[in-house]
Amino acid sequence: MMPRNKEELAAMIAHRDGISFEEAYATVNEVAADLEYAFMRGSLIMAEDILREELGIEPDYLDIFI
């Protein structure tokens, strides 16, 4: 099932990567800040790259951050 919010995404990443929820949630929030910068620049490609490189997830998850 696809996560619907940042908390569910963090839980998925914590489980996948074997890290604590807190660590995963902090990473998700850092990525959210990076994505905000990409959105302000109008760069969807940059946003997609951030998701792939920082979280190892596909652009399908971008909706969680909008």
Where are these regions (language model features)?
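N-terminal acidic leader/helix
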Residues: 1-26
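Short linear loop/turn motifs
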Residues: 23-35, 65-66
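Long, compositionally biased
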Residues: 35-66
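Leucine-/aliphatic-rich long alpha-helical segments
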Residues: 10-16, 31, 35, 48-51
